[in-house]
A protein has these predicted regions:
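A membrane-topology feature that recognizes alpha-helical transmembrane segments
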Residues: 1-197
């Protein structure tokens, strides 16, 4: 069963939705030949396909950010399409480069990242959830090993800092659940759109 959708958008969700529209607008404007944040669209059908696939990818990452904030859950309804779009994106990149290297690297990142987080989920006994495992595997298909490693490191740093602040301010206790998903999705969006990592 799909999660219920609230009839009114919570006040803190509105900036995230506005950010999503802004990022998609930047993607569209970049097609004209590049912008402050984004490079120009690669020529050729595969390159253009890889570019336009960023739009559903970013949208799904924003949805995951919101749902994990709200419900402490990352749904298969979003991670599965994210993985599918990521696989198609990897194939398009390989076609544009006339090489299997991008696809193979991204597949390796997905498998390795998923296995590492699956191990963490077992060792932490629920500290890392199944949704986080699937999210990292899906991100591997988009980012490849180098950028996925950077995003995970940044995510752990941001998450650890945020958790520490919540503990120090008394808003969270040590055994309380903490939404780590946004700590990975937001750096991933930056990586996809700016090449910052």
């Amino acid at each position: 069963m799909l999660p219920s959708v609230p009839t009114q958008v919570p006040i803190f969700r509105r900036p995230l939705l506005a950010l999503g529209f802004f990022l998609c607008a930047k993607l569209i404007l970049a097609k004209a030949g590049g912008s402050f944040l984004l490079p120009a669209v690669t020529t050729g059908v595969p390159g253009k396909a890889a570019f336009w696939l960023l739009i559903p990818g970013v949208f799904l990452l924003l949805v995951i950010t919101v749902t994990d904030f709200e419900q402490r859950l990352i749904f298969d309804d979003t991670t599965l399409p994210l993985a599918v779009f990521g696989l198609v994106h990897s194939i398009a990149l390989s076609c544009a480069a006339a090489s299997y290297a991008p696809l193979l690297k991204n597949l390796f990142a997905a498998v390795a990242g998923g296995l590492i987080f699956l191990t963490l989920a077992y060792l932490t006994r629920g500290g890392v959830g199944g949704g986080d495992v699937k999210l990292i595997a899906a991100l591997g298909l988009w980012l490849g090993p180098e950028r996925l490693t950077a995003v995970v490191c940044v995510g752990f740093f941001i998450g650890g800092l945020a958790a520490l602040l919540l503990l120090l301010t008394g808003q969270k206790k040590r055994k309380d659940a903490f939404a780590y998903g946004p700590c990975f999705t937001l750096p991933a969006i930056l990586a996809l759109l700016t090449g910052i990592f």
